[in-house]
Amino acid sequence: MARIDASKLELTEKVVYINRVAKVVKGGRRFSFSALVVVGDGNGHVGAGLGKAAEVPEAIRKGIEDAKKNMIKVPLNGTTITHQIQGRFGAGKVLMKPAAKGTGVIAGGPVRAILELAGVRDILTKSLGTNNANNMVNATMEGLKQLKTPEEVARLRGKTVEELLG
């Protein structure tokens, strides 16, 4: 898959969570911060990244940079996704189902952030397994990577879109 040039997109950022971590050394504890950030253009492009630094703003900046490097294109069918999918990462699973227009984004915390920035307006989701934000974000991204348009599926099966949809 071709890399998406983030500089050509008008991106919005959303900090999913900030975590303070401690390294225990001889003289006590050394604190640093990790920030999970999601970026997207609201039009099918989205990315997630993790930044770590001694200060919160620096961790967020690094997270944004990482998210821009990990951008993906989400095939949308109007305001929803093209088909049902389940993303998995670690112990986290996210089930995503297309929804009728006007349903809204039915998703919790980290999953909602990704879907809104990807431009999905109507979707049903269920988070299964862990509720660790990092695993939920990565599971959602894995699921969105697996999405295919009806045209792609038809081409892979050697059929026309009409044959496929009946």
UniProtKB/Swiss-Prot annotation:
It comes from the Bacteria. SUPFAM superfamilies: dsRNA-binding domain-like, Ribosomal protein S5 domain 2-like. GO terms for biological process: translation. The keyword Transferase does not apply. Keywords: Ribonucleoprotein, Ribosomal protein, RNA-binding, rRNA-binding. The keyword rRNA-binding applies. Residues 11-74 form the S5 DRBM domain. One of its GO terms (cellular component) is small ribosomal subunit. One of its GO terms (molecular function) is rRNA binding. InterPro entries: Ribosomal_Su5_D2-typ_SF (IPR020568), Ribosomal_uS5 (IPR000851), Ribosomal_uS5_bac-type (IPR005712), Ribosomal_uS5_C (IPR005324), Ribosomal_uS5_N (IPR013810), Ribosomal_uS5_N_CS (IPR018192), Ribsml_uS5_D2-typ_fold_subgr (IPR014721). With S4 and S12 plays an important role in translational accuracy. Belongs to the universal ribosomal protein uS5 family. HAMAP family: Ribosomal_uS5_B (MF_01307_B). Part of the 30S ribosomal subunit. Contacts proteins S4 and S8. The N-terminal domain interacts with the head of the 30S subunit; the C-terminal domain interacts with the body and contacts protein S4. The interaction surface between S4 and S5 is involved in control of translational fidelity. This is Small ribosomal subunit protein uS5.
